[in-house]
Amino acid sequence: PNDMYMEYHFTKTCYVKISLENDSRYSTPNYIWITMSNELIRFLKANNHTLSVTPLGISEEDLRIFKKNLYEIFEDSCSVVYIPAGRSMITLLSQQLSYIYATMDDMQKRSLDTCTKDYLERILRLKPEFSEGLQGLAYSSGRSGLSPRLVVQALDLTQKILRGTYRYSNGEEQIVLEDGKYVKINFSSSGQQECVWILNLLFYYLVQQKEILFIIEEPESHLFPESQKYITELIALVNNCGHSIVLTTHSPYVLGTLNNLLYAKTI
């Protein structure tokens, strides 16, 4: 019916309404109409020319202020970290990734969907943070007020899933084994390639103690059932530390683990 609509409220005064309307004012008929609340319209008008683009791009400070104001409008300070499916290809090309991305022109970068582009840029930006491995990040958590018990628990689960620990050394991503030897990430198993950046991002933001909404696609990819259980427990641990998680999954092992955690009242 033409009077059908959906209305999404972020706050009492900030909302977006999506409805059907046969609009013939344009050469291409538009049947989906989006209406924004007055508060949101005022914000967009006031910030229409806030971000100025220079040859070096948009100023980080301008972008930070804009995001801060935007979060205030939506009354949501939670940053979003999207972790897509098909992660192994990005991990497989890890050493070439910086070069490939640097050689892309602006139009090619814009052709990437926003979620994938954000994921790529986040990985490239955070790699150097793991120069001392997860243990190095764990050491920094000692000054952040995070419970040492939680850090040890997260490290233990990560070790069980990855069968080693991640390290970024001399421009190379590595999985360090218990005997001190390491395997380059592009020579590791498909399961390790799929899960390594889920683990890294979960642990990094756990240590940072910054409120995050994680959207994780198919965390079970290429993992044995036991590892699927462990990665679900790690996700639950991070969720219990003030973060929010959205999962997509086809795995009965993931769902079974979540059910058990719910029955045990640990999530």
Where are these regions (language model features)?
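C-terminal or late-domain output modules
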Residues: T91, L97-L134, I185, N200-F203, ...
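A generic structural signal for alpha->beta connector loops
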Residues: S77-S79, R163, G242
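P-loop NTPase switch/coupling surface
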Residues: P1-C115, G256, L262-I267
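A short, compositionally biased
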Residues: N2-Y5, T11, L162, Y168-E172
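Low-complexity/IDR signal
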Residues: R64, N69-L70, M89, C115, ...
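Switch/communication elements of ASCE P-loop NTPase nucleotide-binding domains
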Residues: P1, N170-I267
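Conserved P-loop NTPase mechanochemical-coupling segment
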Residues: L134-P148, A154-L155, R163-F187
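Low-complexity, serine/threonine/proline-enriched polar segments
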Residues: N2-M4, S24, T114-V151
